[in-house]
């Protein structure tokens, strides 16, 4: 069971989840294999269904027996068999008592910005359905850590769903005004809020306010999938521009995104292009080296005017 420790003065909380130290790490496995290969003067071959580490990937099709029994799937085939398009399983190393892994596709390498719109729509359909299934149990947080530098322990593209008890106060940013608009779709708007804490941070929000994420309709899901995919493509292009060499590109496009858990929901994309240092950690203040107005213009036009 998760252990919650409060700070009485600020009503902020810490979750003690010691089992998380047991998570498998592709980064460490890859380093170990590279060292072995170098010592033997060999190249690493990557068989199907395995990561760069050379170890079997539990999220690849054909390796369903390596995960706990699934709780949801989109696609053909029976439970815990091949044929799925999106698959959801309990997390073996949970943060809280309800913690699920949403596997984006059978592919080990396809990222959201590279998938078909139909596949991305299936991912967001899964988000919506799992939100609905868990909303009576607490505050539902859906998030994606893309890349090892963004907190992912396994490279196979996936998201996570965590349920936090209602009595725990979440220190989460709420909806920001829709300034610096990038693009307007049928049901959603993408923008860079004035309160952007990260360079090229993008928010996506529904035009209709006052709703929770679980209220997104089947008709709205393809539009949402499209605006998120488009935003990720634009951010990646901007960060790849030589004029933005100041941003960290040690690893191919790393980012986090999450869906706000309560009313007036939004999706927030945070490119991890800079590192937080002592000043930010010590003061709680964020330093953004890219003006949100300029970021929105860049993302809208593909360059500064």
Feature roles, as predicted:
Residues 1-156, 162-212, 216-219, 232-235, ...:
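Active-site microenvironments that recognize anionic phosphate/pyrophosphate groups
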């Amino acid at each position: 069971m998760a252990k919650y420790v409060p700070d009485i003065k600020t009503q902020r909380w810490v979750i003690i989840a010691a089992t998380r130290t047991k998570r498998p790490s592709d980064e460490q496995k890859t380093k170990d294999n590279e060292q072995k290969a170098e010592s033997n003067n060999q190249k690493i071959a990557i068989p199907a269904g395995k990561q760069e580490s050379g170890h079997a990937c539990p999220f690849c099709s054909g390796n369903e027996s390596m995960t706990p029994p699934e709780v949801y799937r989109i696609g053909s085939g029976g439970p815990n068999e091949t044929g799925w398009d999106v698959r959801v399983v309990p997390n073996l190393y949970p943060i809280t008592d309800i913690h699920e892994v949403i596997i984006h596709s059978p592919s080990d390498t396809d990222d959201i910005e590279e998938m078909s719109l139909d596949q991305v729509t299936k991912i967001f359909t899964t988000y919506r359905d799992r939100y609905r299934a868990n909303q009576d149990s607490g505050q539902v947080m859906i998030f994606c850590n893309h890349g090892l530098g963004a907190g992912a322990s396994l490279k196979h593209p996936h998201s996570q769903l965590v349920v936090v008890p209602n009595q725990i106060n979440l220190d989460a940013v709420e909806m920001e005004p829709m300034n610096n608009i990038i693009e307007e779709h049928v049901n959603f708007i993408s923008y860079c809020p004035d309160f952007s804490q990260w360079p090229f941070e993008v928010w996506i929000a529904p035009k209709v306010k006052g709703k929770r994420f679980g209220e997104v309709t089947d008709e709205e899901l393809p539009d949402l999938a499209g605006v998120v995919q488009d935003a990720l493509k634009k951010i990646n292009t901007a960060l790849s521009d030589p004029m933005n060499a100041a941003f960290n590109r040690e690893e191919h496009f790393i980012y986090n995104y999450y869906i706000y858990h309560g009313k007036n929901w939004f999706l927030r994309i945070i490119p991890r292009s800079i590192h937080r240092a002592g000043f930010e950690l010590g003061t709680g203040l964020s330093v953004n080296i890219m003006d949100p107005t300029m970021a929105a213009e860049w993302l809208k036009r593909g360059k500064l005017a």
